[in-house]
């Protein structure tokens, strides 16, 4: 029997760590939190100094029993949950359940799950940091007080199943505020004039800049005509040449927030998926002969700090691969995390390259690991050097300007370019070699009419970035927050951008009127600052809770008395129930919209909303092929005559037969490419656009 018991959150983490520690250590998983506030009631005694009433989470009884059994037999119990506030709270709850001594140095933390890091952490165990535990407790209790007080009011006055929360309500507000900006936006006309110029055999473009040596706004066609009328022939002169060398520094290695943003832009990952895959990479990957190793550092961090060891290893790799000129000469300026002294998200070893790891990883794991690895290595590389040139092209009172740039030294851009840098302004644009006094010929002067555009709706990446910039919540809460506002049907995604629903706007208006603090950005930011102060030991958690709740409970009482009941009418489905003849209506469920009988609860008939794709079923030739959704919300295609006909296809039938085998053809999508393939043989053809 092992003398030492080590408790971690997950079986994957337990499996990895046990291999490093040897036979004297038994490592088991708590499967996440074991204690929490009860779901069936508030669980916070507001009359007794906000004392929380923790209970064992339903279903965790057998886990707790197993933990107690092993703890009783062990000489030492070590709590090795994650190195953040959440992990500290899990360790504290475990110590309470297992009745461990408060002063016992039994807490071990490591930022990466590698043999050296884990073994080193066990040489330096410490006591549980109660300030971190209290900060997490305060957040949990705050969220419970808000959710369990506002939600019942919304159920009673608006609709059952609704919720509000400190972070989700602000996120919803951002989406709605942006939608209102778009609705209220009034487009304004403006014009541009672009000229195509020739010098010897080279052609290049330039934009109109000045009239009579001053900026001249082209608001109307009349303004444009004034400029074109002033032109005299096609000859222009180069009146100024400005050459500069520009340095582009690489982006910092990833924090939780920037990882979520970049994975959304480059990999099309939702925030939740990014965190799930990152967790797998952190907890350990089986590298066969090398054993199980955590490939990245802890993925919940807001720090860009890098350890000296990691920097040295990256420098060695860059020198060997690209040469010493590609290594960074900059002094570190990494941002220390607001919450804890973590490192940035980086590979646990630069020498484990994505290509070397590919055979051990799933497709998603490989893509995310490659992103993290390249971003980190690039952050340790030399800046790129760009040569820029600006040409002023003049005729009389009219001046055009051409801007060009070439890459003199690629530096970090050899390996990685941040998505937001993939813009036209950062790409090469070569101009002919011209000097002041040279003559060029205008081959085309092209005016173009434009209208100002409203601000774009939020993508998931932009919403995450805005929440972080405003300091709303923690990066680790963004994924569940975005999930919640979608599951509650407060927002929907259209072309990968968030649009508020009618229900979302109704809920927002009620929260805005009766609980203004909850959606106030400044209030939410101040609350995060107070939570940080609790973690630093500068203020007690009970004082923070009391400062909030004393005024909040008055808002709840006012809402219960004054909020008017709102009737949300169901959308007619346009057909009658085949069971009782009542009109069918559109309802929103967990997996999207469906049809239900308006005579509910007397009639409980429901049916899926199906969309015909205009193709006859290739199996029965009687029904139509319709689009359906699986329980996991994945689109598939079936026959409208189901269950009489059981035709099903994940790919979209196109209504034509294969010229080789006469089976039906389907549209097959892989990434950004679409092609037509046979459902039976190897026939392929390009998809028609």
Curated annotation (Swiss-Prot):
Residues 129-557 form the Topo IA-type catalytic domain. One of its GO terms (cellular component) is chromosome. Residues 3-113 form the Toprim domain. Mg(2+) binds at residues 9, 82. It catalyses: ATP-independent breakage of single-stranded DNA, followed by passage and rejoining. Its EC number is 5.6.2.1. GO terms for molecular function: DNA binding; DNA topoisomerase type I (single strand cut, ATP-independent) activity; zinc ion binding. A zinc finger (C4-type) spans 577-603, 617-645, 658-681. Keywords: DNA-binding, Isomerase, Magnesium, Metal-binding, Repeat, Topoisomerase, Zinc, Zinc-finger. Residues 328-357 are annotated as: Disordered. The record marks 33, 139-140, 143, 148, 155, 300, 488 as: Interaction with DNA. GO terms for biological process: DNA topological change. Residues 163-168 are annotated as: Interaction with DNA. The keyword Isomerase applies. It is an enzyme of class 5 (isomerase). The active site is at 298 (o-(5'-phospho-dna)-tyrosine intermediate). Its cofactor is Mg(2+). Releases the supercoiling and torsional tension of DNA, which is introduced during the DNA replication and transcription, by transiently cleaving and rejoining one strand of the DNA duplex. Introduces a single-strand break via transesterification at a target site in duplex DNA. The scissile phosphodiester is attacked by the catalytic tyrosine of the enzyme, resulting in the formation of a DNA-(5'-phosphotyrosyl)-enzyme intermediate and the expulsion of a 3'-OH DNA strand. The free DNA strand then undergoes passage around the unbroken strand, thus removing DNA supercoils. Monomer. Belongs to the type IA topoisomerase family. This is DNA topoisomerase 1. It comes from Staphylococcus aureus (strain MSSA476). The lineage of its organism: Bacteria, Bacillati, Bacillota, Bacilli, Bacillales. The gene is topA.
């Amino acid at each position: 029997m092992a003398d030492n018991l080590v408790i971690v959150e997950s079986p994957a983490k337990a499996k990895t760590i046990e291999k490093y520690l040897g036979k004297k250590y038994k490592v088991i998983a708590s499967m996440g939190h074991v204690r929490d506030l009860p779901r069936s009631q508030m669980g916070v005694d507001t009359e007794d100094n906000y004392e929380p009433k923790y209970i064992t989470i339903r279903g965790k009884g057998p886990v707790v029993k197993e933990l107690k059994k092993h703890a009783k037999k062990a000489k030492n119990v070590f709590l090795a949950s994650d190195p953040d506030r959440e992990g500290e709270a899990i360790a504290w709850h475990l110590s309470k359940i297992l009745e461990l001594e408060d002063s016992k140095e039994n807490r071990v933390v490591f930022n990466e799950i590698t043999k050296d890091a884990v073994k080193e952490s066990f040489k330096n165990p410490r006591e549980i940091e109660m300030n971190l535990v209290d900060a997490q407790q305060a957040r949990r209790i705050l969220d419970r007080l808000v959710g369990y007080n506002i939600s019942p009011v919304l159920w009673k006055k608006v609709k059952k199943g609704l919720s509000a929360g400190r972070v989700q309500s602000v996120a919803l507000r951002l989406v709605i505020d942006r939608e209102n900006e778009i609705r209220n936006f009034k487009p304004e006309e403006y014009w541009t004039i672009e000229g195509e110029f020739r010098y010897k055999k080279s052609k290049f473009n330039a934009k109109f800049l000045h009239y009579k040596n001053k900026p001249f706004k082209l608001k109307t066609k009349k303004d444009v005509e004034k400029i074109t009328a002033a032109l005299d022939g096609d000859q222009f002169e180069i009146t100024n040449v400005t050459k500069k060398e520009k340095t582009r520094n690489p982006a910092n290695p990833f924090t939780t927030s920037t990882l979520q943003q970049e994975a959304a832009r480059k990999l099309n990952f939702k925030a939740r998926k990014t965190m799930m895959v990152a967790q797998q990479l952190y907890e350990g990957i089986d590298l066969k002969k090398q054993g199980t190793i955590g490939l990245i550092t802890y993925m919940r961090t807001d720090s860009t700090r890098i350890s000296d060891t990691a920097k040295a290893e990256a420098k060695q790799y860059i020198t060997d691969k690209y040469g010493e000129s590609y290594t960074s000469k900059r002094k570190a300026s990494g941002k220390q995390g607001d919450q804890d002294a973590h490192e940035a998200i980086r590979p646990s070893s630069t020498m484990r390259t994505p290509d070397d790891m590919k055979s051990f990883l799933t497709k998603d794991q490989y893509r995310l690991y490659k992103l993290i690895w390249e971003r980190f290595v690039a952050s340790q590389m030399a800046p790129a050097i760009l040569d820029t040139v600006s040409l002023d092209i003049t005729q009389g009172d009219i001046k055009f300007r051409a801007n060009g740039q070439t890459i003199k030294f690629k530096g970090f851009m050899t390996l990685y370019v941040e998505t937001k840098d993939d813009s036209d302004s950062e790409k090469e644009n070569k101009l002919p070699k011209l000097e002041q006094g040279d003559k060029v010929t205008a081959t085309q002067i092209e005016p173009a009419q434009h209208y100002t555009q409203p601000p774009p709706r939020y993508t998931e990446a932009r919403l995450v970035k805005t929440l972080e910039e405003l300091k709303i919540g923690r990066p680790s809460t963004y994924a569940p927050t975005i999930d919640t506002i979608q599951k509650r049907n407060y927002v929907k995604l259209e072309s990968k951008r968030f649009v508020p629903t009618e229900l979302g706007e109704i809920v927002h208006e009620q929260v805005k009127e009766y609980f203004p603090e909850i959606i106030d950005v400044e209030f939410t930011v101040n609350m995060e600052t107070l939570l940080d102060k609790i973690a630093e030991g500068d203020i007690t958690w009970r004082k923070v809770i009391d400062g909030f709740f004393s005024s909040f409970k008055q808002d709840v009482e006012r809402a219960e008395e004054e909020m008017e009941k709102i009737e949300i009418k169901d959308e007619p489905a346009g057909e009658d129930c085949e069971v009782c003849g009542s009109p069918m209506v559109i309802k929103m469920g967990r997996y999207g919209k469906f049809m239900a009988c308006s005579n509910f609860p007397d009639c409980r008939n429901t049916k899926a909303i199906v969309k015909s794709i205009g193709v006859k079923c290739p199996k029965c030739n009687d029904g139509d092929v319709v689009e359906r959704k699986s329980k996991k919300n994945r689109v598939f295609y079936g026959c409208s005559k189901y269950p009489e006909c059981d035709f099903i296809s994940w790919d979209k039938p196109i209504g034509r037969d294969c010229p080789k085998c006469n089976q039906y053809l389907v549209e097959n999508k892989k990434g950004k490419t679409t092609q037509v393939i046979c459902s039976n043989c190897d026939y392929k053809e390009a998809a028609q656009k």
